[in-house]
């Protein structure tokens, strides 16, 4: 379920660069690659995964720690969904570096998870007239 976004059928490096520019101008979350997926498709998979994880967390025999290994977009969408971030907040999140750990840790005092390894922000990312909240 943590499969990265399908980028469709790219023929040339120049085409890839053009599509990346369009995606950045349009917004990473909603842009759909020709013959591929939008960030919303990956978000839906993450949402399904979280439903399963929440059920697993309720089991007494479930381990205290959970490790997810995936790609940068899926990581950012997981963080977006977990913390109920807006699309604008998601689009300002920079991609983690290759091999970077992104750690969510339970705060025993509050009972809430915290992002203890924050992702860098890009304040120049796409801005919308008002934030869009999905949940």
Feature map (PLM): residue ranges:
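Phosphate-handling substructures
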Residues: 1-48
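Acidic, low-complexity terminal tails and accessory targeting/binding regions
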Residues: 1-15, 55-64, 77-135
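Homeobox/homeodomain signature
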Residues: 21-23, 68, 75, 86
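Short, intrinsically disordered low-complexity segments
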Residues: 22, 44, 75, 126-129
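Short amphipathic alpha-helical molecular recognition features
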Residues: 34, 41, 66-67, 93
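A structural signal for well-ordered alpha-helical segments within the folded catalytic domains
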Residues: 40, 44-48, 72-77, 98-99
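Helix-loop module immediately N-terminal to the HCX5R catalytic loop
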Residues: 47-55
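Generic beta-sheet signal
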Residues: 62-72
